[in-house]
Amino acid sequence: MSYTVLHRDDLPRDESTYEFVGSQHEDTEISFIWVDMRPGGKIRLHKHPYKEIFIIQEGIATFTVGSTILEAHAGQIIIVPAEVPHKFMNLSGKPLKQIDIHLNRQFITDWLEE
């Protein structure tokens, strides 16, 4: 039996995210983004050719999914269908922590806003 242990700090990152790309880790079937976003942070409008699942761990996220605006709280899961434009932001005064699961071996993103 073989297995892999990774540490979050070993993943590629930017200011508020760590990225796990499945194709770079024994061709794992999914990719995910580990989000730790400061108050006021946001991800601009985009879409993917596969479903994306957001697991809200701490804080509150304001999502736009298609034409719907919703507030997601810790403990909630948001499932966005393939090809549906979406974005989110942290409008609260506290950090937002969530896991964004991409049902694909790599990230494929069509950015719809600059």
Which functions belong to the PLM regions below?
Residues 68-82:
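Short acidic-glycine-tyrosine-enriched beta hairpin
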Residues 45, 63-64, 80, 86-92:
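Short beta-strand His + acidic residue motifs that chelate non-heme Fe in jelly-roll/DSBH
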Residues 1-30, 111-114:
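A short, N-terminal "cap"/entry segment at the start of jelly-roll beta-barrel domains
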Residues 33-48:
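Conserved short histidine dyad/triad with adjacent acidic residue
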Residues 51, 56-61:
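Glycine- and acidic-residue-biased ligand/ion/polar-headgroup-sensing regions
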Residues 39, 49-50, 68, 84-85, ...:
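A generic "binding-loop/recognition-motif" signal
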Residues 79, 94-111:
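A short hydrophobic beta-strand segment most commonly corresponding to one strand
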Residues 35, 60, 68-70:
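Well-ordered beta-strand scaffold positions
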